[in-house]
Amino acid sequence: NLTISFSGTLDAHMNRLEKEDGRKMTNLELSLRTGLSDRYIQDLRKEEKNVSFETVCAICIGLHLHPKFSNDLISKSRNDYPLTEEGYFDQFLIEHHYMETLDLCNDKLREMGYRTWGKEL
């Protein structure tokens, strides 16, 4: 069940998802996929924090969330896609490249001259 909060929803996704090897998704694994610290991810799962749009997108791609779940998480983070060409491209990546790596998405963002998501790995 997904809650109405960002932190509760992120925690629920982390608890239900499995890595490729069938084991539970961990803060450390998501940290390795996004460049965000495992401590920061732990904090995001426990308490409501202001989180940037780019950080939420990095988490969505790192978890390979289906676009419906990504859009829900983005909304709960009190963010939205900017109504710009960059925002439309962000939405395109979330909706069509969610099974890719964050590195690949960031390469596409860089090619377009847009801000990258997460931290550089």
Summary of predicted features, one role per range:
Residues 28, 39, 68:
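Key DNA-contact positions within bacterial/archaeal DNA-binding proteins
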Residues 1-26, 102-121:
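A short, Lys/Arg-rich alpha-helix, primarily the initiator
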Residues 48-62:
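Short, basic-rich loop-to-helix N-cap that marks the start of a DNA-contacting helix
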Residues 71-100:
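Short, charged recognition helix plus adjacent turn
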Residues 3-7, 38, 86:
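Short, leucine-enriched amphipathic alpha-helices that occur as contiguous helical runs
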Residues 31-51, 76-78:
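Recognition helix of helix-turn-helix/homeodomain-like DNA-binding domains
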Residues 24-33, 59:
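Short alpha-helical "recognition helix" segments of helix-turn-helix
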